[in-house]
């Protein structure tokens, strides 16, 4: 029932503030700039931040970014080392790095034992722990917002980790009593979640409890805690699982690469990044009972008028039970030698409504149900297209994931309960940009093609300045 006590590693904990954080997002202009595989900067179609690795010192308020990540995972997953590596890497780039201590470890090291508490006392302690976590994080978040430098805030576990150590009924009661909701606690509070898989799952020879005073789990319990902590974050739009399929050094590099990729920082081959987005066509979905635990979201995409053929912009509205998050994505190819950059900005509802005036009439609005789930240490997003929309989207279901695996290793981690028709990675026929076009593909000049995938080889090459939608991330 404890909250994230299994790994006393230092990284920043993120969590949501009771109602106040949500109100702040509604009332203030959003100042968090994020560049993720699709994340960062201003929603203005023409503005693009510099992403040079050697940017040092202060930055202009317009370009400044405050990026909040959660390091989570099972016991002996590498969070302490990972936090240190992230800190060193980003400080070398000139960023200010804040490290929020793990609240559970701080409180439990003061003599608290759950075995000594009554059920009522344990519930109240857990609730106060989360409130404390929220306040500690808010202190660091405000420091990040007031700094004149780009800031990375590393949270050693976040609020949703607490749900792994408490019953569903008690968790929902606690959320309702504090005016919390999953969209604010899980999706809007943090920019990215990094789950470092426990050594007990895939690297058993290296599993140890010797270096942590609050850790005593055996291998089987460590595996269980690892799964629970990952399941707690299913549904976050930018959730990366860093498994033990490589040696530890490469695992750390993959973690750093994941953050850099989502921030839009060009690292070249410094970390030998191999992870890539994969997309699959799926037919005839099975009953919900065949899925592992999942989170469903309503998602709405609007393409916007852009400043030119090299720029593409869109809005995304994503939510559950009438709680929403809003993201603006601006995409430009060939920035500072990078193949593609997607700049994402978290928006307030007011900013979102204002930007809707820039909708591109050449595109349908895209409506989806998005199902997020975790299986075989792999995070998947299943997009089920809904009406209204173009007839070409009727019944369309696409599965997406990010992986560095290939061959049989990749095949073995895919969900066996889904009827996967074929891989469509890079196929422009399944690009959201093309799927949303109102004009017929055979006559429109807006259809974007690629000469790198299957049947596209028979088509004319892409003009040099044209946006490549098959590289896009569907948010």
Swiss-Prot record:
Function: GTP-binding protein which is required for the light-dependent internalization of the TRPL ion channel from the rhabdomere on the apical surface of photoreceptor cells to the cell body and for the recycling of TRPL back to the rhabdomere in the dark. Binds to 3-phosphoinositide (PtdIns(3)P) and phosphatic acid and so may interact with membranes, particularly the early endosome membrane where PtdIns(3)P is predominantly localized. Plays a role in preventing photoreceptor degeneration.
GO terms (BP aspect): photoreceptor cell maintenance; protein transport
The protein's name: TRPL translocation defect protein 14
GO cellular component term, pick one: cytosol
Name of the encoding gene: Ttd14
Region ranges (Disordered): 1-59, 452-475
Effect of residue 75 to L: Lack of GTP-binding, defective light-induced internalization of TRPL, late-onset light-dependent photoreceptor degeneration and larval lethality
GO MF annotation terms: GTP binding; phosphatidic acid binding; phosphatidylinositol binding
Record's keyword terms, sorted: Cytoplasm, GTP-binding, Lipid-binding, Nucleotide-binding, Protein transport, Transport
Tissue expression notes: Isoform A: Expressed in the head. Isoform B: Expressed in the head.
Intracellular or extracellular location(s): Cytoplasm, Cytosol
Residue ranges, compositional bias (Polar residues): 1-19
Domain of life of the native organism: Eukaryota
Main localization of the protein described in the UniProt heading: cytoplasm
